[in-house]
Amino acid sequence: MTMPDLHPLNASLIPLLGTWVGPGEGAYPTIASFSYEETLVFSHVGKPFLALQQRTVERVSGAPLHAESGYLRPQGDDTVEVVLSQPSGVAEIHVGRVDETEAGVEIDVSSVGVHTAPSAKLVRETRRRYVVEGDTLTCDFWMAAMGEPLTHHLTSVLTRRT
């Protein structure tokens, strides 16, 4: 099967394409700090979006921790929408900016809607930032959940594998 041509609206997101792997750290007022290993894959099918698949495992044991999947939907200017779903019962819709840089791209999005399944923990707000500089991707995540205000929760520094 041949790879379809990249849709022109995805041009600013090209630096994200590929598989990224690396360590991360998490902290939040209601839990103990922790470390993890993250794998993040950005791909395309020739349509005006990139697909995102993410998973994390405990760094020492390899036990699964988290997973999510979704789409980055560039809007033709410097705006991007990000739609994500998690098996924990959380669905997020974000809007934000894509800024092309000399070294890659910076994406900063904030939630315009967070919905939770009846059995999921209540998450009220989220923010995500992805910064590509060459073959390094730095990811940061903030959330307002469990009665806490918007607080930095996760950071990972990933290296491009493919």
Regions found by a protein language model. Name each.
Residues M1-F49, R55-P64, E133-D135, W142-T162:
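Amphipathic/hydrophobic helical signal segments and adjacent flexible N-terminal regions
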Residues G22, L50-Q54, V80-L84, E106-S111, ...:
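Short hydrophobic/aromatic-rich beta-strand segments that constitute the beta-sheet cores
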Residues G22-Y36, V83-V95, V109:
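N-terminal short leaders/motifs
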Residues S35-E37, V45-K47, L65-S69, Q75-T79, ...:
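Short connector loops at helix/strand junctions that flank enzyme active sites
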Residues E37-S43, E68-R73, I93-D99, E125-V131, ...:
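Hydrophobic/aromatic beta-strand elements that line small-molecule binding cavities or substrate pockets
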Residues R59-D99:
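Helix-adjacent hinge/juxtasegments
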Residues P87, G113-T116, D135-L137, M143-M146:
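Short acidic/polar capping segments at secondary-structure boundaries
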Residues G89-V90, I107-R127:
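Acidic, glycine-rich flexible loop segments
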